[in-house]
Amino acid sequence: MSMSEEEKMVLQQKIRDRTPKLPISKVKRIGKVDPESILTSNMAYVATAFATELFVQSFVEQALFGAQLRRGKKKAGLRLTNDALVECVRNRDDYIFLEDVVRHIEKPKTSSGLHKLSAKPVGQGQEAEQKDASMEEDIPEEDLQEDDEMDVDETEPAERPAASKASDVNKASASAKSILSAFKYAPESAPQIHGSTQTEEDEGDEKEEDEDEEEEIDPEVQTQLQEVEKMNVVADLDEESEVSSDEDEASADDG
């Protein structure tokens, strides 16, 4: 009797249901760790694989159920995490033997943040320089000239105080010199020495300087200076002695 295709598919499905999804070769590799694994049959390995699948399925369902209860109805879909497995082992006595295997992983409180640093693109610096250059080109020349004038005006006030101070000092020194020169005594008539001559130009310059000084002095100061000059003028004693000697001789002749 030939089997139909439907019967073949049903038979294959039964075989798949009876065989575990976990590979038998991996189960045997784990079983060989035990020195007595030589006496284990293939059917025992198959049964162990089925038991492992059922255990894993039950453990995962319990962990997801506990996570759903803790979160409530915030999220419809849940993802299996290590924390959910740890809570399941802690809350159920059936899985206490897994405490040494399933452990809570503590995350560092402060992360260094090095992984967050992102490298700059290669052309980013060049693009920024090109933007700055284009912005400078867009600025008209009139605005640039106004900026230069503003800079000059800002620097001028710093230079003005020094110039004003120098001018004030010069004015004060000139006024002091003019006052001191006005209070000088009248010079005595010095005898003329042969061979020493004074040019007319020097005399004219001195007269002009004296006139300028007299113009700068106030009228009241000028009157005071004239009185001082009169008091300081000393009479020539030689002339007085000659006059007195002439008078004595005339009186002697008359006698």
UniProtKB/Swiss-Prot annotation:
Regions of compositional bias (Low complexity) in chain numbering: 171-184
Subcellular localization(s) per the UniProt record: Nucleus
Comp. bias regions, Acidic residues: 135-156, 199-219, 236-255
Recorded GO MF terms: protein heterodimerization activity
Example of a GO biological process term: DNA-templated DNA replication
Alphabetically ordered keywords of this record: DNA replication, Nucleus
A single cellular component GO annotation: CHRAC
Region of interest called Disordered, as start-end residue ranges on this chain: 109-255
InterPro entries membership: Histone-fold, Transcr_DNA_Rep_Reg
Domain of life, per lineage: Eukaryota
Miscellaneous notes: In eukaryotes there are five DNA polymerases: alpha, beta, gamma, delta, and epsilon which are responsible for different reactions of DNA synthesis.
Subunit-level organization: Heterotetramer. Consists of four subunits: POL2, DPB2, DPB3 and DPB4.
Function: As accessory component of the DNA polymerase epsilon (DNA polymerase II) participates in chromosomal DNA replication.
Protein's UniProt name: DNA polymerase epsilon subunit C
Organism: Candida glabrata (strain ATCC 2001 / BCRC 20586 / JCM 3761 / NBRC 0622 / NRRL Y-65 / CBS 138)
